[in-house]
Regions:
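Structured core elements
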Residues: 2, 9-11, 31-33, 84-86, ...
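Glycine-rich, flexible beta-strand/loop modules in the N-terminal catalytic cores of phosphate-handling
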Residues: 2-78, 166-190
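Glycine-rich anion/phosphate-binding loop at the beta-strand->alpha-helix junction
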Residues: 9, 15, 79-116
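Long, low-complexity N-terminal extensions
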Residues: 80-85, 109, 115-118, 122-123, ...
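Long, charge-patterned amphipathic alpha-helical coiled-coil/hairpin "stalk" segments used as oligomerization
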Residues: 96-116, 122-166
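Long, contiguous binding/interaction regions
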Residues: 151, 177-178, 182-189, 193-204
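Conserved small/polar residues in nucleotide/adenosyl-binding loops
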Residues: 210-215
């Protein structure tokens, strides 16, 4: 997925196992992993595997992606399977977590469609279309899809995750040494509601481009 100069490689794999707390429950699970390639930023970032541990930021983003995309799936119908979403940032220019959710949903939908074809299933496993976008206040003005310079200087920073029925899944808003009003939140919502249908349409197109059997396993 590409949002300006932010590029994230997303893929989804379905495994025949679940975490211990779900064994013999009949329910499935979805989890996500996120990472930034060393050359994804202007200055090289060390691989977290080389450091021996994940940063708090990485863990937070992984949890956000997982929480968001679990809302897309009926885990009861999935059965005792685990869906693993991998999001690897190739180029980072702000909004990598929201881009990961956008691309992660497309990869998830394609993996589920491939799984249903393989086992001739008709169950509605995907129940919500999920997308995300960043908004913020930059120099006193509400802006959407912030790039890195905008994000790093924003007075207010916000990440929004929504389903295609207009309901919110996540609304993370933080003042960066600044307070913000209810009106600011309403401005954010107005911006997001204008853009989300465009993102959803792009997701639909991305899914339709890979409907043939030959392309089912190609990452988005």
């Amino acid at each position: 997925v590409k949002l300006g100069n932010t590029h994230v490689l997303c893929s989804a794999v379905i495994e025949d196992r679940v975490p211990g707390f779900l064994r013999n429950s009949g329910k499935g699970w979805l989890t996500a992993e996120y990472g930034m390639l060393p050359s994804s930023t202007n200055e090289r970032v060390d691989r977290e595997a080389a450091r021996g541990k994940q940063s708090g930021r990485t863990q937070e983003i992984q949890r956000l992606i997982g929480r968001s995309l679990r809302c897309a799936v009926n885990l009861d119908i999935l059965g005792e399977k685990t869906i693993k979403i991998d999001c690897d940032v190739i180029s980072a220019d702000g909004g990598t977590r929201t881009a990961s959710i956008i691309g992660g949903y497309v990869s998830l939908a394609r993996a589920i469609n491939s799984y249903k074809k393989k086992y001739n299933l008709n169950n509605q496993i995907i129940v919500n279309q999920i997308a995300a976008i960043s908004v913020g206040v930059v120099k006193g003005t509400a802006c959407i899809d912030l790039d890195y310079p905008e994000d790093s200087s924003a007075e207010v920073d916000c990440n929004v995750v929504m389903s295609n029925d207009g309901q919110f899944i996540e609304f993370q808003s933080t003042g960066e040494e600044a307070k913000f009003t209810k009106q600011t939140i309403l401005e954010f919502i107005e911006l997001v509601e204008k853009v989300m249908p465009i993102i959803n349409k792009a997701q639909d197109i991305a899914c339709l481009l890979y409907t043939s059997d030959a392309a089912d396993d190609t990452p988005c």
